[in-house]
Amino acid sequence: MKNLGNMMKQAQQMQARMQEMQSKLAEVEVNGVSAGGMVSILLNGKGELKQIKLDKSVVDPEDVEVLEDLIVAAFNDAKNKVEAHMAEETAKLMGGLKLPPGFKLPF
């Protein structure tokens, strides 16, 4: 029973830490770029799109496909940065809590 009590306590601690991390992530803003910064995408820590900036030189009505690819590349850059930040914050907040092998946070 002592182990069950410890597990419940750890679960409560984990839940509180996750809530803290989620509120912090909402405040984080990450910029992803492509084409040497001519396409820029701003995401918050929750992965929500906040802003897209395009240099006029990448806007060619005759070649929309290139612009689409640049936007996707900038978004993926920002998304990767958000995920790296989340992993770093998760490691900080969850330090000391033992998780089963292969268990990934956030859930």
Swiss-Prot record:
Gene Ontology molecular function terms on file: DNA binding
Subunit structure: Homodimer.
GO CC term, one of those recorded: bacterial nucleoid
Localization terms from the record: Cytoplasm, Nucleoid
Recorded family membership: Belongs to the YbaB/EbfC family.
Domain of life: Bacteria
Originating organism: Rhodospirillum centenum (strain ATCC 51521 / SW)
Name by which UniProt lists this protein: Nucleoid-associated protein RC1_2305
Upper lineage: Bacteria, Pseudomonadati, Pseudomonadota, Alphaproteobacteria, Rhodospirillales
